[in-house]
Amino acid sequence: MIMQSLFSNKYKFKDTEEKLNAYWDKIKLYKWKNLQGKQFIIDTPPPTISGQLHIGHVFSYCHTDFIARYQRMLGKDVLYPIGFDDNGLPTERLVEKIKKVRAADIDRKEFKALCNEVSAKFRMEFKILFQSLGISYDWDLEYHTISEEIQKLSQMSFIALYNMGKIYRKLQPIFWDCADRTAIARVEVEEKEMSSFMSTIAFSTEAGERINIATTRPELMPACVALFFNPLDIRYQHLQGQYAIVPIFGNKVPILSDEQVKIDKGTGLVMCCTFGDELDVYWWNKHNLNTQIIISKSGTLDLKHNIAETDTLSGKLHGVSIVEARKLVLETLSKCNLLIKKEEILHNVKCAERSGMPIEILLSNQWFIKVVEVKHELLEQVRKINWYPQSMRKQIEMWIDGLNWDWCISRQRYFGIPFPVWYSKRDNEEIIIPDVNELPIDPTETLPQGYSKEEVEADVDVMDTWATSSLSPQFNSIHTGINSIPLVPASLRAQSHEIIRSWAFYTILQAYYHHNSIPWENIMVSGWCLAADKSKMSKSKGNALIPNQLLQEYGADVIRYWAANSRLGSDTVFSDEVLQLGKRLVTKLWNASKFVSMFVSQCQIPDLNYVTETMDKWVLTKLYKVIVKATESFDVFEYCVALDYIESFFWKDFCDNYLELVKKRAYGESVTSKENLSAVNTLSFVLTTLLKMLAPFMPYITEEIYSTLYNNGSIHDHDNWPIVNTSLCNEMDEQLGEDFIEILNQVRKIKANAQLSVKCKIYKLIINSENYDFPTSWENDLKAVCNAEHIVRDKRTSYYDDKFLVSVQFAS
C-alpha cells in the first residue's frame, strides 16, 4: 500500500496567516458570548498612541494572548477587549512631532482635531499589527479613551468621587514639568544621574557669625525661608532660634532644628527653599514657614516682587532660565568672595518621565484624589489579589508605604478628558457640577443650566491619562449599555512591571473607592524586552526593532514562540537565536505532522482502545504527565514553563524516540493488524494533543495542521484543551519505556563511536541485565529501531553500575 502525505514539503506561513485571519474573523472565533457562569474577563492594557509599536510591545501583548487562548480552550467565555489610550500628553507629543505644530500656538479645537486624526491613523496601524500577530481580541469590544463613551465613564467617576469627598481642589505644592508646562503626579517623576556642582556658600547670622551652606541649587537662594540643622549636631545647637542673612539677596530667615537633617551631609546646615525638593515641602508644612515662589511655570526665574531697581541682581535674574540663573548667582558669589568651594559631582536629579527635564515644585491650584489617608486600606486590597510572580507584590507594597502625596490628577494640556466643572462667580457659590445625564461635557464649550457665560468660569484643565486608564475594568460597560460604573472583579490583569506604581496602583484605588472591591482576582506581570546591550528598548534610543520586518521574515508563530520564552516578570534580551529555535520548531512540527498524516485516514478520531503495545503506552504516559504539568503551569500563568514541558516532550520523546521506533508498525511492515492499529491511533492521538497544547503559542501552524488532518472545527474552539485523563498513565509501561530508551541510546552511541550509520544492521544485540524479561512487542520495536536481527539477553554481573550493559555484533 502506497501512503501519501497530505502536506506540501514546506510550510508557507504567509499564505496560511492571511487565509486563517480571514477565516477566524468570518466565524467570529474570539467573540465574547456573555455566558453566565463560565466567564474569564481580561483587563487588557490599552497601548498608548505615542508612536509606532516596537518588538518590546509585541513581547508583552503576546503573553496576555497565551492566557486568553488557553482559557478559551478550557471552555471559558473569554472577554478579551482591546483599547487604545489616545488621550493625554503622549498623544499630544506625537501630534506635535508629526504635524510640526505646538499645541500652545494654535487654536485648541484645531489641535484636538489634529489629535483625533493622528489617533485614528495609529489605531488602524496597531490593529493591523495585532491581527498579524494572531492576538485573539474580540474587536467588537474595541474602545479608545478619548471616545465619548469613555469620556462619560471618566467624568462619572470624577463626579462620584467628588460627591464622596475623595476628590478635592487645593492650592498646594505640586510637581511641575517646565518643558510640557503641566502638573504631574509623583509616579511620573524618575531619577536621572546628572553632573552638577556642590557649592559651599558663606552665610552669616544676624549677629555676624559666619556659617556655611552646601547646595546644588544656589539660584533658589531668593526663595530661602529657613536654615535647618540636626538637633543632635553640637556644632549648631547654639544657633537655635537665631536668624541668618542670605548672602547677596539679604533676606532674613530663621535657623531651626529638625531630625531630617543628615549631620554628615554637606556642612550639616541646610537651606530650606520653597521649593527645592520634597524635604523642603515637608519642612514648610511642619514648621509653618513663609512662602517665596521664584520659579515660573515656564522654568524661568520670576523675581518681580524682589526687584527694587532694574540694575540689581534680582533684575538681572528675572526672566532668565534656571541654568543661566545658577551660573549668574555663582559668578556673583565668587566676585563677593562668598563662594568658598565649588565641587563637581554626579547626583540623582528628579526628572519628568515624559520630557526628561528636571522637575520643579511649585504652588498651584490642582485637583487631587485622596491617597495618603487610605494607605492601610489599599495595602489590604493589594494582599487580596493573587500576584504572579509573587515578588511583584512587594513593589507595590513598598510604593504605597512610601506615599506621602495625594494623586494630582489635573493636567494643563489640551487633548484629554475635561473636568466637568465650572467655577461660579455668584456670591456664596464655588463649584458647579453637571447632572450625570448631561455627560460627557466640555465646560469650555458648554454652559451649566441657568447660568450665563459672564457668571461662570470653565475649568480648562484635563484629567491625567491614568485617571481614565485606571477605570479599564469598567470599560466593558460601554458594550452592555449599563448607565453606571459596574465592577465585577476581572479574572486577570496583564501588564508589565514598570507600570505597577501607576496603572496597577491607580486601578486598585479606583476599585476600592467606587466599589470597595478588588479590580481583578489575579495580576500577571511581564518583564521588559531588552536590547542587545541589556537596555530597555526605546524608539528614542534607536534600539527598537520593528515587528513588521520580523513578521515578514519569520512569521507570527516564530515571533510568538520567542515571546513565550521569557519567565514571568523577568526582563529578556532580544535574541535571534531564540527566533531560529522557533523557526526550527515550526519546521519540525510540519515535518512530523507530514509523517503522521499518512496514517490519519485510518483514525481521524483516535480510539485508545486499540492501543495495546508497550511503547505506545509509554508515550501516552509521558504525554499524560506533560498535559498535567502544562495545565498546572497555565493555571498559574506560567506560560513559559508550560511551553518548556510541551516542547521538551515534542523534541525528545515524540520526535527523537517515538517516531523512530514506531515507523515499522505505522507502515504496517511485517506486523499484525493489532500492532499497526495501536501505532496509528497513538500517533494520531499524540499529535492532536500536541497541536492543542501548542495552539496558544503557535495558533497558525497548529490550526493549519489540525484543519488538514481532522475535520473537526477550529483547534482554538472552546473545550479543546486536552483533558487530564488518568487512564493514559501506566507507571509500569513508562518504566519499560525508559529502559527501552536507555538501551536505544547505548546502541546509538556504539554506532556513533564506530562512525557507522544509525541504519547499520546489527546481527546480535546483547543486553546484559539481572532478572529482566521484556514484552514481545517491546523487543519487536527495539529490533526495528536498532535494525537488529536478534536480541539476546544475558544475566549481568553485579559490578556494573548501569542497569543495562549493551553490546552488539554487527552483520558481516
UniProtKB/Swiss-Prot annotation:
EC number: 6.1.1.9
Disulphide bonds in the chain: none
Annotated InterPro entries: aa-tRNA-synth_I_CS (IPR001412), aa-tRNA-synth_Ia (IPR002300), Anticodon_Ia_Val (IPR033705), M/V/L/I-tRNA-synth_anticd-bd (IPR013155), Rossmann-like_a/b/a_fold (IPR014729), tRNAsynth_Ia_anticodon-bd (IPR009080), Val/Leu/Ile-tRNA-synth_edit (IPR009008), Valine-tRNA_ligase_type_2 (IPR022874)
Source organism of this protein record: Ehrlichia ruminantium (strain Gardel)
Compartment annotation: Cytoplasm
Catalytic activity: tRNA(Val) + L-valine + ATP = L-valyl-tRNA(Val) + AMP + diphosphate
Pfam families in the record: Anticodon_1 (PF08264), tRNA-synt_1 (PF00133)
'HIGH' region, short sequence motif: residues: 47-57
Domain topic, free-text comment: ValRS has two distinct active sites: one for aminoacylation and one for editing. The misactivated threonine is translocated from the active site to the editing site.
Designated name of the protein: Valine--tRNA ligase
Alphabetical UniProt keywords: Aminoacyl-tRNA synthetase, ATP-binding, Cytoplasm, Ligase, Nucleotide-binding, Protein biosynthesis
CC annotations in GO: cytosol
Top EC class for this record: ligase
GO aspect biological process, one term: valyl-tRNA aminoacylation
Major place of residence: cytoplasm
Subunit structure: Monomer.
GO molecular function, one term: valine-tRNA ligase activity
